């Protein structure tokens, strides 16, 4: 899978995604992550990529020209499945969406900044707007990193144990059940006996019951009638 991220702060994403599991996925050729400095596509003497909005509103707006140049250039090199804009206005990013996007081959992610982007970019260049939550960040870099991490870990071979991803929170619209490791007892706090029993069917039943209980208690909005 290849993900091209367009940003004015590539180092912010690079520092996050070039280490640990996602960094190793790149080293092993399972994920190709390319960061593009948007300012390199500005023809302005000062490499500016923003300007004042028409109509006199406060703030600055990302210009259409440099964004069009980089997206057009990328599209001459390969076919992209989606051109995504990180925006609080977009559809909510969740585990099913991560699953869906992980099955694609090539993605472009445009990180928003300032007041927003020239609306013509949304109308003519973007295929999908995605939000990681109902709040506003200083830029779309953190959102792009969050989405990339969630998507990349689902690519076959990225996780050493593929079953780990399948049992994650939200995969069945349920929170994950509790997990424990050695020692079996610490300061009088014991691991549930069922997990030490070795009875796989009973353990599976316990895990499902715990997942349902935790979901009802912590995220009742996930429980469907």
Curated annotation (Swiss-Prot):
Its EC number is 2.1.1.228. Keywords: Cytoplasm, Methyltransferase, S-adenosyl-L-methionine, Transferase, tRNA processing. The keyword Methyltransferase applies. HAMAP family: TrmD. Its main location: cytoplasm. GO terms for biological process: tRNA N1-guanine methylation. Belongs to the RNA methyltransferase TrmD family. Specifically methylates guanosine-37 in various tRNAs. It is found in: Cytoplasm. Homodimer. GO terms for cellular component: cytosol. It comes from Porphyromonas gingivalis (strain ATCC BAA-308 / W83). GO terms for molecular function: tRNA (guanine(37)-N1)-methyltransferase activity. It catalyses: guanosine(37) in tRNA + S-adenosyl-L-methionine = N(1)-methylguanosine(37) in tRNA + S-adenosyl-L-homocysteine + H(+). The keyword Transferase applies. It comes from the Bacteria. Pfam families: tRNA_m1G_MT (PF01746). InterPro entries: Alpha/beta_knot_MTases, tRNA_m1G_MeTrfase_C_sf, tRNA_m1G_MeTrfase_TrmD, tRNA_m1G_MTases_N, tRNA_MeTrfase_TRMD/TRM10. The gene is trmD. S-adenosyl-L-methionine binds at residues 112, 132-137. CDD domains: TrmD-like. This is tRNA (guanine-N(1)-)-methyltransferase.
């Amino acid at each position: 899978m290849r993900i091209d991220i367009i940003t004015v702060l590539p180092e912010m994403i690079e520092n996050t995604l070039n280490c640990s599991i996602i960094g190793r996925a790149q080293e092993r050729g399972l994920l190709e992550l390319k960061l593009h400095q948007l300012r390199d596509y500005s023809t302005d003497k000062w490499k500016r990529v923003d300007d004042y909005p028409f109509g006199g509103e406060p703030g600055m707006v990302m210009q259409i020209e440099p964004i069009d140049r980089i997206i057009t250039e990328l599209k001459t090199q390969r076919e992209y499945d989606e051109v995504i804009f990180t925006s609080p206005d977009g559809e909510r990013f969740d585990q099913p969406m991560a699953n869906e996007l992980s099955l694609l081959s090539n993605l472009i992610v445009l990180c928003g900044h300032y007041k927003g982007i020239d609306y013509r970019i949304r109308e003519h260049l973007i295929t999908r707007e995605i939000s990681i939550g109902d709040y506003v960040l200083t830029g779309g870099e953190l959102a792009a990193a969050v989405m990339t991490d969630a998507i990349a870990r689902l690519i076959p071979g990225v996780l050493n144990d593929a079953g780990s991803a399948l049992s994650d929170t939200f995969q069945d619209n349920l929170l994950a059940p509790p997990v424990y490791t050695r020692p079996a007892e610490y300061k009088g706090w014991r691991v549930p006996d069922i997990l030490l029993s070795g009875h796989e069917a009973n353990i599976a039943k316990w895990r499902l019951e715990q997942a349902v209980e935790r979901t009802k208690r912590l995220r009742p909005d996930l429980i469907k009638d």
